[in-house]
């Protein structure tokens, strides 16, 4: 206020998430009206968050949306204008739940081209996965029967095997719970993970990919030829949630941004590289 600045704010309304926001009642409406009259404050918008819009049964969503609309009416009756009204998360967007009367949406998991759940109407919106995770083979060695691989010896070879090392681990956000379960795509074929995933590396079986060699690309998430490893597959194998898989990928992993299959930018936090973002 001393600098003559104005804060544009959005009010949060708790309609059923029990996370943040005003309870939608008369007392809260009075409080919002008082806030709207404060100097240096402009109520630019108001939002709520759907807790169960990704479920087939929309009853809870409908109850939340009704509370939100009623609270908007309470504010309007007190002379409070709400220019931007927004509720929908990715599930709401895919389902087209509140396309009438609102001004904005807040996409989350759908930005990555992923559906929020198996219960949303996927035929309404065609999403294409936008993220891949790739690395390469740094080393290949042959081991004999009885040889243990990685910490704890949880995998022991029962035959001669070719073992490839990939420089990605749980320090990069590649879940340790994928140990002895996950796979990496090499030359369009699946190479199963052997033993425990380390902090910075893991090992994979390339015995049946004789053409594999050091320097070959390894796809941890994404497509290689006819094979594909999805985020949902990794979530199922790890006993987790596909949102977690996306969020776990750490800053040590360089980001390369593509448009029409061509690299247009790169972020490499480790080497302090930020290229190609002048257009943003």
Predicted ranges, named:
Residues 10-12, 25, 221, 233-234:
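Bulky hydrophobic/aromatic packing residues
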Residues 8-10, 44-45, 83-85, 103-104, ...:
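Structural motif
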Residues 1-8, 14-136, 143-144, 266:
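Active-site loop/helix belt of alpha/beta enzymes
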Residues 142-280:
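C-terminal accessory subdomain/extension
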């Amino acid at each position: 206020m001393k600098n003559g600045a104005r804060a544009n704010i959005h009010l949060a309304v708790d309609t059923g998430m029990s996370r943040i926001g005003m309870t939608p009642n008369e007392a809260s409406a009075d409080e919002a009206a008082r806030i709207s009259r404060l100097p240096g404050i402009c109520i630019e918008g108001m939002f709520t968050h759907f807790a169960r819009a990704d479920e087939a049964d929309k009853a809870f969503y409908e109850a939340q949306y009704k509370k939100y609309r009623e609270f908007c009416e309470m504010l309007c009756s007190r002379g409070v204008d709400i220019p931007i009204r927004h509720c929908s998360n990715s599930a709401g967007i895919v389902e087209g739940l509140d396309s009438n009367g609102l001004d904005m949406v807040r996409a989350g998991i759908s930005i990555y081209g992923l559906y929020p759940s198996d219960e949303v109407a996927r035929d309404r919106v065609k999403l294409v996965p936008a993220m891949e995770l790739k690395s390469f083979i740094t080393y290949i060695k042959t081991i004999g029967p009885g040889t243990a691989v990685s910490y704890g010896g949880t995998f022991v070879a029962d035959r001669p095997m070719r073992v490839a090392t990939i420089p990605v681990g749980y320090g990069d956000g590649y879940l340790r719970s994928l140990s002895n379960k996950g796979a990496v795509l090499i030359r369009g074929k699946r190479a199963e993970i052997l033993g425990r995933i380390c902090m910075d590396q893991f090992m994979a079986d390339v015995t049946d990919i004789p053409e594999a060699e050091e320097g070959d690309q390894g796809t941890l998430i994404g497509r290689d030829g006819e094979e594909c490893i999805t985020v949902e597959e990794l979530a199922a194998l790890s006993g987790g949630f596909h949102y977690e898989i996306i969020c776990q990928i750490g800053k040590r992993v360089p980001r390369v941004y593509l448009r029409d299959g061509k690299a247009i930018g790169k972020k490499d936090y480790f080497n302090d590289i930020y290229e190609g973002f002048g257009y943003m």
